[in-house]
Amino acid sequence: VNESGELKELLKKADFSLSMGKRSGKNNLYLFNSIEYTKHINKLYLREKLRDSVKENFKGFEMYYQPVVDASKLSSCSNKVDGVKVIGAEALLRWSCPEFGLLGADQIVPILEESGLIAPVGRWILIKTFTQCKMWNEYNKRFHMSVNLSYMQFERSDIVLDVQMALEKSGVNPENVILEITESGYIDHVELQKILDEFHAMKIRVDIDDFGTGYSNLRYIQNLHANTLKLDYSFVHKAVLDKGGESERKVIEYIINMAHDLGMNVCLEGVESESDVEILAPLKADKYQGYLFGKPMSPYAFIDENRKFIVDE
């Protein structure tokens, strides 16, 4: 074995296997897996690169924006794309890595959460997106911006102070800001309620993202004073299937009706074709989001694609 290279690599692999064995419980044998080891090494590499990016004034981090449209404007249109009314955007994190290219939030947020970097990056996201919203509100005062919050931001930073600072630095109208949280994973619900009450006192709306993937009931969500339920795209994908979609559509319709009765709106995510709209229109959702109306894009591309909606009618 070559001391300078192969031995060190062998020890790394042995340490990895030992760590994986401990994770699986006491007295368990873990057989080395090269694929899992490669993922582990890549993760460590990305963690260090992300840490460097944060130190270098968030170099490589970008925000992309996906249109959110008014579903009520589409039900009577023969051409669903031409009849679309973009009313806002969801801000989505991206990070440009020389070795791996442009990475999405699902690839980097878990690493940011585990490493503790989510607190500074989260503050950067709030300021960046609030400022972008302020710029677009110069042309359309009603245009809103949705920003995702990680549950770790509630635990590793003073999230209320972070939001207040972003509001002050950007000068955005808080009524045009929507903070998105998921159903589960947060600190105790009493503390969460207090924090959300402070957001509402600032006139900031709160949406529940990926609704249906957790175990919350609508009454609990109502107690959080949520503005909109965003149904997970998996619901929509099942609902538009030729076979088996009818039962899923009934579930979606039930959720929409209940949400409306409780004073909440519903956004359907993952709408990808005009046929999807035709199938979903009778369910009476309030908003749609999906590739039919636009993929996540840079702010410049978003302006080019949606200029007529950024400018007030």
Where are these regions (language model features)?
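EAL-family c-di-GMP phosphodiesterase catalytic domain
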Residues: 2, 38, 98-100, 150-157, ...
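Catalytic core of bacterial c-di-GMP phosphodiesterases, primarily the EAL and HD-GYP domains
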Residues: 1-2, 29, 39, 85-90, ...
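Structural preference for long, well-ordered alpha-helical segments in enzyme cores
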Residues: 10-17, 49, 91, 107, ...
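Alpha-helical scaffolding flanking metal-ion-dependent phosphate/phosphodiester catalytic sites
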Residues: 13-14, 147, 221
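Alpha-helix termination/capping residues and helix-transition junctions
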Residues: 23, 58, 139, 169-174, ...
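Active-site core of bacterial EAL-family cyclic-dinucleotide phosphodiesterase domains
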Residues: 42-111, 148, 180, 208, ...
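C-di-GMP signaling machinery
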Residues: 3-8, 16-65, 75-78, 112-116, ...
